[in-house]
């Protein structure tokens, strides 16, 4: 279904009134006002429909990451990477994964992290937000990842959470995580890490599994 386009309105530069009545000037003035009010009507009627919100452009960002993410060490805070901008307006994605706000407002951030545990015991991971490299109060969430099923068969948990908070233009937002046992599939070292996988065709076709998915959406002005 095609989306309606909102066209902004601008007051016309009305023709100057002559010292004496002029039918030509009167007709021109009516024409200018008619065009202007038609534009205003089109603007308000588009917004007042059931799908009026679909015509608006709202600040947002959505990003993902296509790599395994390894904690720096046991119980050491580590930044979460996002290497792919999936969609964005009014935000900038910076390497290795922070996002900078272009507009002030109240925003909601949502994320999903594909945790893997290759160890033979349950282990925990905690995720939280930083704004301008300062921990955001009440933004942490803990996840418990079960012990592996067997050697070479890890357990998986999709760690999801969200938070709503105020952001000023220019603020830099980051996700951090830590785990009590940092795993590394390249060593290999048993423990917890954030897992990714490419798309597959067998035994069934499916898309790639990002290690991290995140989005920030505008809720309200400050």
What is the predicted role of each segment?
Residues 2-4, 34, 45, 49-222:
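Extracellular jelly-roll beta-sandwich "head" domains, especially the C-terminal globular C1q domain
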Residues 16, 23-27, 81, 101:
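Alpha-helical interaction segments
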């Amino acid at each position: 279904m095609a989306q309606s386009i909102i066209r902004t309105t601008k007051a016309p530069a009305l023709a100057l009134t002559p010292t004496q009545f002029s039918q030509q000037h009167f007709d021109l003035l009516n024409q200018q006002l008619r065009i202007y009010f038609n534009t205003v009507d089109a603007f308000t009627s588009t917004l007042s429909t059931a799908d009026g919100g679909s015509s608006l452009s709202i600040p947002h960002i959505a990003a993902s990451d296509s790599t395994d993410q390894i904690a720096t060490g046991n119980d050491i805070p580590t930044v979460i990477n996002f290497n792919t901008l999936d969609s964005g307006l009014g935000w900038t994605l910076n390497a290795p994964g922070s996002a900078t706000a272009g507009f002030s407002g109240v925003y909601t951030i949502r994320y999903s992290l594909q945790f893997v545990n290759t160890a033979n015991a349950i282990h925990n991971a905690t995720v939280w937000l930083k704004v301008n490299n300062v921990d955001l109060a009440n933004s942490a969430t803990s996840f418990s990842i079960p012990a592996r099923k067997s050697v070479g068969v890890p357990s998986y948990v999709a760690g999801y959470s969200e938070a709503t908070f105020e952001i000023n233009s220019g603020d830099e937002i980051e996700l951090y995580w830590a785990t009590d046992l940092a795993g590394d599939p390249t060593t290999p070292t048993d423990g917890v890490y954030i897992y990714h996988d490419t798309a597959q065709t067998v035994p069934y076709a499916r898309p790639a599994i990002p290690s991290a998915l995140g989005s920030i959406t505008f809720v309200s002005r400050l």
